[in-house]
Amino acid sequence: MTDNSHSDIMIETEGLSKYYGDFIAVEDLTFSIKRGEVVAFLGPNGAGKSTTMKMLTGYLAPSTGTAKICGLEVADNRDEVANRIGYLPENGPLYEEMTPISLLNFFADARSIEASQKASRIEKVIDQCALQTVLNKPIGKLSRGFRQRVGMANVLLHEPDVLIMDEPTAGLDPNQVLEVRKTIKGLGKTILLSTHILQEVPEVADRIILINHGRLI
């Protein structure tokens, strides 16, 4: 197993493809993302963005080609890759009856974060995602923007090297979009985020990867 966690390349694909019978979901994607880059994965709905992200995170096996996170082939190192990434799917599930603080405590335990680090990790993600004012409110009663930030805090708990976010501002009102963009820009992580909104790209990303009909443009 090769570990290039100290390399500049944090996300890498080569010839990555996914087929469903005769249907081409994603075909021959080759790209790389360097440490510290925030990259927008831009394309219309149905372009193949979510399929690609699921292959990068190990939730979906590619038909052909390879995906690497921190130098590790995803297909061969799913557990280790899961420790290196924070994955925020579009409309990711949250326990709406829980409060943000109870949810963060629950997932800190579920991820076996050491007791000596648990409080400081939770405090750090609360600060990163600006959740101080809603910690004890039921998640189901929070605005969509705050719920998205709770989701971000959750995937940051284990201090991943790479963040993969699928449409992180989808369905938010303009003020919520600004809040989530500010949070993303302040994280200082290697981030791949998908969007179908061109105007959003310069506000949050360093560069763009364009995809349409499952192929890079």
Regions found by a protein language model. Give the residues of each.
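ABC transporter nucleotide-binding domains
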Residues: D8-T13, K18-N212
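Conserved beta-strand-loop-alpha-helix hinge in the C-terminal portion
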Residues: R215-I217
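Pre-NBD coupling/linker segments of ABC/ABC-like ATPases
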Residues: M1-S7
